[in-house]
Structures are given as C-alpha cells and as structure tokens.
C-alpha cells in the first residue's frame, strides 16, 4: 500500500483539508485499498484538537467533512512508514528534516516535498490561513 502524509504546522487548517481532498480523490478512483492518506503537524500544540472551525466550514462548502479528524504531531515513525510526505511550505519542509532521524536508515523511506511542486502555478508555498481568512483560496490551491 502506498502511504501519503500531508503536513502543515498545527494540523488544523491546511493538512487536514489536503487529507480530506485526497481521500475523496482516492475513493472516487476506487483505490482505497491501494493508497493510505493521513495528515500531521510539525508542532504538537494542537495535538488531539479538531480542525479549525473555519477549515471545517470551508470544506463543508465543498462537500467534505473534517469533523472526525484530529490533529497529531509528526512522529519519527512517519519517516519509516510513509512513502511521500507533502509539506505546505518551506518552513514545514525544514521542520520535517529536523525531525527525521538521519542516523537510522529505517527512517529514510519517506520522500519530503512541498505540495506546490505539483501545482507550480500557485507559487511555492500554501499560505497558513489561520491568522487571516484565506481558507477558500487555500482549498483551491490544494485541490
């Protein structure tokens, strides 16, 4: 099974939105048994929390339900378990590489990339909408 992890800072805005969008795409393609999708944050200060209410509302307008998702921090094991880790911005990439246990070859499996490498028409980084109201634009970028 191919494993894909979306990562942002707190795992309450961008990465849960990306997780829900990708899960819908995987389900629509009938590939639920081939592709596993999850999300996490580079910081743990929202660990166990629901996504931000504004993310929930934005996703709902697009037919997605984020209410069952819970924030979790990136773990060392993620680098061994996931095939691809897609970060929302350059700071997330840097934080991920700081968390990767480089001395242990088991944790070298995951490839870390910025999500917008796959959609360069949107620039380099998906902005964090937490401090401003860019939730619809962020949804569009990720989708």
Language model: regions and residue ranges:
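Hydrophobic structural packing positions in well-ordered secondary structure
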Residues: 8, 59, 86-87, 142
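Conserved active-site segments centered on acidic
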Residues: 1-81
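Helix N-cap/beta->alpha junction signal
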Residues: 15, 89-90
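Phosphate-binding/catalytic loops
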Residues: 84, 90-143
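Generic ordered-secondary-structure signal
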Residues: 2-5, 26-27, 69, 79, ...
């Amino acid at each position: 099974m191919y494993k894909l992890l979306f990562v942002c800072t707190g795992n309450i805005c961008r990465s849960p939105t990306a997780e829900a969008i990708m899960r819908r795409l995987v389900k629509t393609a009938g590939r639920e048994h081939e592709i596993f999708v999850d999300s996490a944050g580079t910081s743990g200060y929202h660990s166990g929390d629901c996504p931000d209410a504004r993310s929930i509302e934005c996703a709902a307008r697009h037919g997605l339900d984020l209410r069952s998702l819970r924030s979790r921090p990136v773990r060392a094991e993620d680098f061994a378990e996931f095939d691809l880790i897609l970060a929302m911005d350059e700071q997330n990439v840097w934080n991920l590489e700081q968390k990767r246990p480089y001395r242990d070859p088991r944790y070298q499996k995951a490839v870390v990339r910025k999500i917008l490498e796959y959609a360069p028409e949107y620039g380099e980084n998906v902005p964090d909408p937490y401090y401003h109201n860019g939730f619809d634009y962020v949804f569009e970028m990720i989708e």
